[in-house]
Structure formats: structure tokens, C-alpha cells
Amino acid sequence: MDEKYYIGTDLKFLINIEAEGFSMDSDDYEIELRCNSRSVTVHKEDIVEDGEDHYLCVDTTQFGSGMLQMVVYAYVPDEHFVDDHTRTEIAVVNLCELRKTYGG
């Protein structure tokens, strides 16, 4: 994962998803952000494509103050169980480092 920038309440970072069975082209997936015991599901319209890269744009105010770290999960279809998804951790974003680096 390669962080791009953090300015104010807008967080944008490149997501490299290599979770087995996960495809950005599939409609059958969800991405979940967890921070400060809060959870937000990311919808397909929150994913911005730039060539072959995919960026995730997030309004971080929904997590409240004092954020330290955000974990990004992908839910991928489980081929062994119908209507079941496997949660796979795909990224950990250190929000303090982003703020320090980009002055948010």
C-alpha cells in the first residue's frame, strides 16, 4: 500500500489488493474501514480508478477524533460457502504518520 496524501478530512491512498479471490472488477465485494472501533463500508463509487491503479477516497471525520490507525479489510466471496464472504486484511494506514507527513 502506498499512501498518497492526507489533507484536512480527506484521505486518499492507493490500494493494492492482492487478497486471493478479490478483483476490483467484480461487483461481488465490499471494503470495510475500521478505526476507533467504528466501521464504515466503502462502496464501489468511493473507489477512483486512475489507469490500472485504484484509489480509495475517505472522509475521515466519520471516525471521530484521536485516530491512530485505520485497518482496511476486503470481503471476498468464499467459494466453499454460498452467500459467505471471507474478511481479509489488506492494509493498515498509520494516520498519525500521514498527518505528520502531509500536514493534515
Label every model-predicted segment.
Residues 1-104:
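Contiguous segments within soluble domain cores/interaction surfaces
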